[in-house]
Amino acid sequence: MIENQIINNAINFIFSHIDEDLNVETIAEFCGYSKFYLTRIFKAETGESIYSFIKRVKIEQSAWRVKIEQGRSISEIAEDYGYSASNYATLFKEHFEKSPAQFRKENSESAAAGFFTGRENTLETYEE
């Protein structure tokens, strides 16, 4: 069960420092274990390597920002997570099967529609 606590500590550290240049050594040092041990138990417990996990979390969190932060360029958001614009676009497309620009466009349209639909539904609920 101690391994679960180590993994939880590592994951919490990753989420808290996701916009930094993370590496296994830094995470292992924070957890108080060797990088070899941490790498082994992380993969065994999660089924994913630490680097794969970090990459996935960065792409998923940055996608939320691409959707919400309409006033910022996609390149700026990519840089926040340590990616060049072209590298970011490639990783983003691998993960979501669409470019960041397509994702932003589709999600901004659906978010606006959902917002108004949600408000209408809420008002109807309160009126009943």
Each language-model region and where it sits:
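Short alpha-helical segments used as structural interaction elements across diverse proteins
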Residues: G32, Y37, S52-K55, A101
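Gly/Ala-rich beta-loop-alpha elbow adjacent to hydrolase catalytic centers
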Residues: G82, K93
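Short coil/turn motifs that cap or connect alpha-helices
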Residues: S34, S49, S73, S84, ...
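Long, mid-chain structured domain cores
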Residues: S86-L91, K98-Q102, E106
